């Protein structure tokens, strides 16, 4: 499953919190959907300490690059360092 691949690819971040929700059912039949799935990701990692939002998102998108757009059509990210909670 795509969820398992995403989790595996992001293990290097050693997240202390990780919540991945597949919301594809909410988007079935929408115009422009290439068949990939829609995900919301909430992740907390010390790896994000000192990095801004754009840098954090770039790290995640680079790790998942080969899954976009075939397996992942949309990905909403909420990224935090532990000290921000």
Task: List PLM regions with ranges.
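N-terminal, polar/charged subdomain of small-to-medium soluble alpha/beta proteins
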Residues: 1-85
